[in-house]
Swiss-Prot record:
SUPFAM superfamilies: alpha/beta-Hydrolases
Protein name: Esterase FrsA
InterPro entries, alphabetized: AB_hydrolase_fold, FrsA, FrsA-like, FrsA_esterase
Lineage, uppermost ranks: Bacteria, Pseudomonadati, Pseudomonadota, Gammaproteobacteria, Enterobacterales
Entry's EC annotation: 3.1.1.1
Reaction(s) the record says it catalyses: a carboxylic ester + H2O = an alcohol + a carboxylate + H(+)
Length: 416
């Protein structure tokens, strides 16, 4: 008798769970055109989610595997929440986004459990973690199937890091007024503690298990540790809502690093990408004496939060994600836009004045989420600012070169 497919054991077909695109009740714009961002993916006609092939491939997924899973989703004839959108199959079954990516993740998990070579097994576990993360994407609240996929991603990631180079420690941080949060401290294999450390401030559509490549390829070779933390309302930080004090959780963690023996708390920098840059730059303003430097990638700190025309041009999924993080899934566009404007660091008075903290901001031309002036606003607010323009073609080479440049810059600031 053939062994049961692992995905069938983990997730049996179910039909009573809400479909992801139906969770946020907003007016849909159904953009009849293609939206492309080098970081942030491609929003094609016919898809609810933004298809972020570059970032998924950079994390380790093969382009062929990405196409294979997307093809299974696109070919489904099952009932959809919106028949115009391929990735809105209702129920946990073939063709459903979470089902298909989780099924692929389970295949790699099975490969990992059958592989007796530690290094190869570790890479299989990492592939599984990446696939489970895509299954959960964009990680909206009140999506129980996505939450299960997040849990599987975290477990697979912890299994992977047990077998791959370097060491990972899960750290718990007490947070005033609520539940503690957990972060992953990634420690470089060829260095001695206490380590200079980068505090990761990720995008709103990422999990902290998504950042292994940044650590392994860019920070670890430079002897730098990476501390990851889930964004408010996601993963291990799910009990915390995103508020105008966006940096609250990261600030509490930053203040407690002097109690973490493996971290040199006098040599800490922050790395923020997309909305995470909002947190990183805010920390530069509020915790100047605790941060050596801040590096930002495709930052979202002002324009997208205040410009309604720009908000109308980004994918519905992104605006849904913002509404979900803010706990505003059932409010009108007007109310959401008013609230978003309060998240602008310029409106908060935290940008536009000179900060002593060195800040680097990297950007792409014609980025729909982060115009170049967003990065200029950041670097002009630092007494030691630097603007880095990333070539859009070839995209992967430009991305890799930028990350190496940013890592060298961080190392220089951390070793002054």
């Amino acid at each position: 008798m053939p062994p049961k497919n692992l995905s069938e054991e983990l997730f049996k077909p179910r039909f009573k769970h809400p479909e992801t695109s139906s969770l946020v009740r907003r007016v849909r714009h159904h953009h009849p055109f293609l939206i492309h961002a080098a970081l942030g993916g491609e929003h094609s006609v016919g898809w609810y989610r933004t298809i972020d092939r570059l970032l998924w491939a950079w994390r380790g997924l093969s382009p062929q595997e990405i196409v294979e899973v997307l093809s299974r989703i696109a070919a489904s004839t099952s009932e959809h929440t919106d028949e115009r959108l391929l990735d809105t199959v209702m129920g946990y079954r073939g063709g459903n986004w979470i089902y298909e990516w989780s099924k692929q993740g389970a295949l790699w998990q099975q490969k990992a459990s059958q592989n007796h070579d530690e290094q190869q097994a570790g890479h299989c576990w990492l592939q599984a973690a990446n696939l489970y993360s895509v299954a959960s994407y964009p990680h909206l609240k009140e999506d129980p199937l996505a939450e299960q996929a997040q849990l599987l991603a975290s477990r697979a990631y912890q299994q992977a890091t047990l077998l791959l180079p370097g060491e990972l420690k899960e750290l718990e941080f007490a947070i005033p007024g609520g539940s503690p949060v957990s972060g992953f401290l990634h420690m470089p294999p060829d260095a001695r503690p206490p380590y200079p450390t980068v505090l990761m401030c990720g995008s709103l559509d990422s999990l902290q298990s998504d950042h292994y490549r940044l650590f392994h390829d860019y920070l670890a070779p430079r002897g730098i540790a990476l501390l990851t933390l889930d964004m408010p309302s996601v993963g291990f930080s799910a009990k915390w809502k995103l508020t105008q004090d966006t940096s609250f959780l990261h600030q509490q963690v930053l203040r407690q690093l002097e109690n973490v023996a493996w971290v040199d708390h006098t040599r800490v920098a922050a790395f923020g990408y997309r909305f995470g840059a909002n947190i990183a730059v805010r920390l530069a303003s509020l915790e100047t004496h605790r941060l050596r430097a801040v590096a930002c990638l495709g930052p979202v700190v002002h324009r997208l939060l205040t410009d309604t025309d720009l908000q109308d041009r980004v994918p519905d999924m992104y605006m849904d994600m913002l509404a979900s993080r803010l706990g505003m899934s059932g409010t009108s566009d007007g109310t959401l836009r008013t609230e978003l404007s309060c998240f602008s660091l310029k409106m908060q008075g935290l940008l536009g004045r000179r900060l002593p903290t060195p800040m680097l901001s990297a950007c792409w031309a014609n980025d729909p989420f982060s115009p170049e002036e967003e990065s200029r606003l950041i670097v002009n607010s630092s007494s030691a600012g630097r603007l880095l323009k990333i070539p859009t073609s070839p995209a992967r080479i430009g991305f890799d070169t930028a990350l190496r440049d940013m890592s060298d810059w961080l190392l220089a600031k951390l070793t002054l």
